[in-house]
């Protein structure tokens, strides 16, 4: 549909993180290298607008693993506060861009706003004196929503993590202990943990990222007062992040697939509720666009049927039914493990179809997807809503599309050695030109 872009007000783009998300932990950013693309795109857009109304990019920092309702409420409060303070003004064009679980947060937010448009929300003030903003004031600004790799119908990975809660708690406990024990160098502790628990993980870039983070938060690494202050700040951020994960892991319950219709989370809305949801978007002039990601196939699983669940104590479930793994030698162990966890489980393609179809981002051609196809975290067929077969399909893993698809040296002086990493190591062929093309298209849609 053709749209007319505003020539008098700003486009305000807000990036919302997904599960385990953050704006930044020390110098590690959730959305990595998106700002340079935005700045380059925005200069050209502002020149074309002819009025100097430069688009604005915001990064929202949410709780990492809290339930969707809690995360949505925090996003609402953040937006309402910006309205009250004049950062978001009447006539501005608000666009929310979300990766992964962040898309469910946005759906829950908009659902709540649409259901209670006259709700009065107090901001910044004492009882009886606070500024107030109505829900409809936020709805009136919101014009675009972009979904990136969002588990619109849940993910098998959540089911797998929930089934292995004891292992997850042990891992988080070990990491919290490493951060808390200031009397022993953190990197040495991490290496010792890896030697005890999973030596092969130490060769993955995810392990390298964790090691970098621990090095960065060690105040003994430098005598420079600014470096020491940055280390203490990074330490506090990571400690708080891990504390949140330890105390509130409700997001996993909201992401579990195969329980469609219970209404507890947007991932499990039934067909009639989803229709009411999209009708509400249309009523308020909100347009959406979905991007799905599909990683390289790490195992040779059976066509047209769900894969068996991966059970750590059952070796017969570790690879495909015939036991002959066909993983690319370039994929690392983290990707193979997460891919296998996501491949098997309760997720089904809506309507009981054997496969689904999406539109390749690079060529515009249709591509068939198996129920077990995934990006290492989310089943790809779960991302195909509300656009269905028109969903733009990007070849890449769950971290690629947010900038973590290659290892790049850090530019800013800090103890951290690298700025970004290939966190999942899927060998999916995701490149710099794809990253830039996707994000330029996202920003163009937000402002369109």
What residues fall within each predicted segment?
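Active-site catalytic motif of lipid deacylating hydrolases and related acyltransferases
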Residues: 4-94, 152, 163
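Gly/Ala-rich beta-loop-alpha elbow adjacent to hydrolase catalytic centers
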Residues: 98-102, 106
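Generic hydrophobic alpha-helical segments
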Residues: 71-79, 106, 438, 442
């Amino acid at each position: 549909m053709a749209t007319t872009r505003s020539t008098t007000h700003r486009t305000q783009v807000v990036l919302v993180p997904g599960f385990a998300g953050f704006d930044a932990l020390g110098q590690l950013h959730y959305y990595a290298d998106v700002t340079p693309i935005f700045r380059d795109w925005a200069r050209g857009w502002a020149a074309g607008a002819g009025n100097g109304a430069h688009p604005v990019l915001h990064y929202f920092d949410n709780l990492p693993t809290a339930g969707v309702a809690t995360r949505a409420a925090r996003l609402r409060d953040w937006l309402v506060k910006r309205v009250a303070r004049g950062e978001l003004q009447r006539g501005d064009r608000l666009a929310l861009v979300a990766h992964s679980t962040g898309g469910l947060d946005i759906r829950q937010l908009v659902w709540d706003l649409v259901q209670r448009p006259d709700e009065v929300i107090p901001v910044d003030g004492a009882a009886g004196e606070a500024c107030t903003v109505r829900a409809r004031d936020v709805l009136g600004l919101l014009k675009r929503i972009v979904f990136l790799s969002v588990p619109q119908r849940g993910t098998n990975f959540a089911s797998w993590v929930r089934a292995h809660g004891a292992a997850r708690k042990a891992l988080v406990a070990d990491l919290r202990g490493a951060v808390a024990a200031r009397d022993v160098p953190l990197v040495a502790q991490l290496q010792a943990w890896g030697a005890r628990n999973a030596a092969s993980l130490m060769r993955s870039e995810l392990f390298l990222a964790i090691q970098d983070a621990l090095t960065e938060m060690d105040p003994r690494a430098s005598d420079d007062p600014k470096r020491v202050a940055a280390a203490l700040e990074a330490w506090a951020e990571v400690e708080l992040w891990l504390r949140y994960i330890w105390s509130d892991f409700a997001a996993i319950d909201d992401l579990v697939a195969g329980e469609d219709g219970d209404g507890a989370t947007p991932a499990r809305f039934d067909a009639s509720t989803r229709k009411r949801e999209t009708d509400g978007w249309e009523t308020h002039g909100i347009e959406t666009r979905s991007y799905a990601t599909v990683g390289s196939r790490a195992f040779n699983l059976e066509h047209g049927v769900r894969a068996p669940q991966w059970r750590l104590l059952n070796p017969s479930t570790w690879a495909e039914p015939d036991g002959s793994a066909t993983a690319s030698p370039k994929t690392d162990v983290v990707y193979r493990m997460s891919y296998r966890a996501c491949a098997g489980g309760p997720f089904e393609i809506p309507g009981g179809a054997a496969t689904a179809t999406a539109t390749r981002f690079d060529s515009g051609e249709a591509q068939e997807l198996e129920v077990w196809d995934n990006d290492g975290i989310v089943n790809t067929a779960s991302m195909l809503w509300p656009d269905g077969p028109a969903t733009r399909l990007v070849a890449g893993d769950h971290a690629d599309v947010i900038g973590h698809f290659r290892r790049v040296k850090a530019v800013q002086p800090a103890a951290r050695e690298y700025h970004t990493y290939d966190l999942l190591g899927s060998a999916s062929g995701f490149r710099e030109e794809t990253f830039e093309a996707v994000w330029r298209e996202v920003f163009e849609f937000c402002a369109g």
